[in-house]
């Protein structure tokens, strides 16, 4: 059986794995696998990544969300809408999902607001218990009149997807605790596009570009990794239960990328599909194959006669697109 290529993953320029936004490039992929991976990862990212969300609030002498609060500019409905934008991270080692299931509302560690100085109330004014962290501390909550003491408790839990206030209300058996909708997903945006890459003269592969933005509770890279893990755990039983020799099954060619790269080295620079100027400059410099090109350092290529900055950048990009590298500079 012909094995599949092992692809590489590149993070976008000037991005890191801890950022809440990232563009991830998967290449080279077998034809058709760009959409297969892109669509499945996108669906899981949008609906199945675990997050943390407000599910109830408690205010002294307030029993429902339509009640007004003296000395507060906003009504309670607007305050709840503002609080739904609160991004909280719960340390699962301190207060994990299993412990949350076993903890009653009376013993739940709550986030507390005790605001008496008047003025603008922000998320930074919320006191958090051990294991809870507020990400968007500049978030606006309400405006409180001077001399008014405003108190509130916030209940936050771990979950997946979306839960309506009615579903949350069924779990609350306490007086004066108001249930709210919960949107647990830390992923704000997912998009992907698939393009072609010519790896050899007769072979064209897919390139998948996956764009992910999160609310900061998890990084974009972590969200992508989690979505892949979820898919893997769902696919694995299909193989293990239907195929006895699962461990002997080899699908990915571990040497495919290397061998493909080696074979592409010997071919003409014509395959790079360079602009006329870049192509002619290389030819005049006696560079006719990719092998001859990758045997040069960046400094040596920059010194090629009549090769401008634009042509230099084009050549470097064409080499990187084939997962090849130039010769290292000697110290």
Curated annotation (Swiss-Prot):
Q: What class of enzyme is it?
A: transferase
User: What are the alphabetically sorted keywords of the record?
Assistant: DNA-directed RNA polymerase, Nucleotidyltransferase, Transcription, Transferase
Q: Where is this region: Alpha N-terminal domain (alpha-NTD)?
A: 1-242
CDD domains cross-referenced by the UniProt entry? RNAP_alpha_NTD
> Which reaction(s) does the protein catalyse, per the Swiss-Prot or TrEMBL entry?
RNA(n) + a ribonucleoside 5'-triphosphate = RNA(n+1) + diphosphate
One BP annotation, GO? DNA-templated transcription
Q: Name one GO cellular component term.
A: cytoplasm
Q: Which SMART domains match?
A: RPOLD
Q: Which SUPFAM superfamilies match?
A: C-terminal domain of RNA polymerase alpha subunit, Insert subdomain of RNA polymerase alpha subunit, RBP11-like subunits of RNA polymerase
Protein origin, superkingdom: Bacteria
What are the start and end residues of every segment in region (Alpha C-terminal domain (alpha-CTD))?
258-331
Q: Does the keyword Transmembrane helix apply?
A: no
Q: Could you say which residues form the signal peptide?
A: none
For this protein, the Enzyme Commission number is 2.7.7.6
Q: What are the GO MF terms of this UniProt record?
A: DNA binding; DNA-directed RNA polymerase activity; protein dimerization activity
Per the record, the domain comment is: The N-terminal domain is essential for RNAP assembly and basal transcription, whereas the C-terminal domain is involved in interaction with transcriptional regulators and with upstream promoter elements.
Q: Which NCBIfam families match?
A: PRK05182.2-5, rpoA
Q: How does it assemble?
A: Homodimer. The RNAP catalytic core consists of 2 alpha, 1 beta, 1 beta' and 1 omega subunit. When a sigma factor is associated with the core the holoenzyme is formed, which can initiate transcription.
What the entry lists under HAMAP family is as follows:
RNApol_bact_RpoA
Function, as annotated: DNA-dependent RNA polymerase catalyzes the transcription of DNA into RNA using the four ribonucleoside triphosphates as substrates.
Say which family it is in. Belongs to the RNA polymerase alpha chain family.
The protein in question is named DNA-directed RNA polymerase subunit alpha
Can you name the source organism?
Malacoplasma penetrans (strain HF-2) (Mycoplasma penetrans)
